Every structure is written in C-alpha cells, then in structure tokens.
C-alpha cells in the first residue's frame, strides 16, 4: 500500500514518526481504530512516579505518534522464573470494537477502554491506582495518561496457573467468547509441573470476564516447557473448530461454545480431534528430558495457521 522502497531510522528518511519504547520489546504492534498498541518494559519510564521494572502496554495515535496512555503492571516477585526481568508485557492486544483485550505480565486477562482514562473510569473495575502500584506501597494516583481497566481475570489467582518466564497469549475472539492459552509451565528448576491440574486453554465471557469453559484435557503433567501457543479458529467440512497447540506437542481441535453457560457454571470444551506432532517422542516423565540434546519430547510455541483446509 504505497510503502517506501527504503527507510533509514538514523536520518528519519521515509519515517513519519517514531516513539521511544523500553529496552526490551517482545510484543507485536497492533493497529486498530486510529491507535497503535505495543507491549514493552519500563526501562525508560514515561511516568517518573513509576520507577523500576514493570510490564507496560503503550498506546499511541496512529497518525501522529502522540503518546496517549499506558498500562503499567508491577512485576511478580515470587521468583524471576514467573516474570523474567525486563521482559515487559509480551502479549499483543486483540481489539474488538471499543474493547482492547490483553494478557499482562502477571497472567491477568484484561479488558481495557481504548480511550484510556481520558473519558473517565468506566468500571466495573475502578481500582487502577492500587493495581499499578507494587504491593506494600502507597497507591499511585491515576491520570488521563493511564489505562482504564474495565475488568480483569487473574489466571494465577483464580486458576492456580504457574506461568513460566513470562505470560504470552494472543487472545482469540469468537462471538461472545475469548479463548486464551494460560502459559502454564515448568517450575524454577525446569524439573516439575507445579500446577498439573491447571487448564491450558480457557474461555471467558467477553462482556464480563467470567470463566465459562476450560479444555478439560489435563495437559499439565505432559507439558515439556510452557503453554505459549495461542488458539486459532478454523472450519473443516463445515465444522467450526478451535485449534489449539498444547505444551505437550499435541494439536487439539475443540468445538466452539455455542451459548453462554448459566451463571456459575464452567463447562468442559468438547474435543473433536487431536494430532500428536511427535508420536515417537518420550511420553512419560517428560520434564526429565529438559536439556537433553539427543532425545526429548516436543512442544509447540507458534500459533496454528490454517490455510486450504490444513493446519500449519
């Protein structure tokens, strides 16, 4: 679309605007509704009150590069293997209408207002000041350049997920539902799965953040490293399918939810099929093979891509 043949960041040749991020940026920029969203770290704080390591999601104006607002999330302090130093927020956002969905560095599925707090605190979540401040410190008051959290779902606190290194998920929107991989993975020593019963794939009600379904496959004990592969939606022979690659090297096909379950009910996703991408690999005590360069299980970290009726 009329892209230049070349560009030079040093001389700013063919560069419309640039914006300073942190020192490490693992997220993918997403452009929607005239805004640019990208996760980074806090090595170069935009808010002098927010000193130190944090996860950050920044929002800029697409046309001018003006900084609009940021989500600042304190680090998990349990150990570095929960929330690796200076990783920032690694997950890309998903934008649907006037809602922005993202998974924070603390394993929280968040719904944000794309306008930030410039148009007021919309709620129902209204404790942004406490949320953006490390535990034990006086809450940092919020302003117009801070994020407006509408709701959040804490996968660690509410599901017992043990994320590894960092949370990563590209949230899939399907009708009234959000499909999210949980980043459940290994312990600090890369030897065991601390949360074997925690789900690998969950479904939330998009409007409220309520948990409505889980994969129910108990993938946990078979996870070789972590659950970083995000779900995708496809249709095979007229059958809608949620395609999900587990941390056990198996690709699963689930039937999408058709209706929101009654209040308080969490259902199990119906599995349509599964395919083991490495059937000859070890299947028992898989974590004992970590570091083995000759024989080991496999896991999948990329998002499934569907084309021509095939999953890649």
Where is each model-derived feature located?
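Noncatalytic, solvent-exposed loop/strand surfaces
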Residues: 1-312
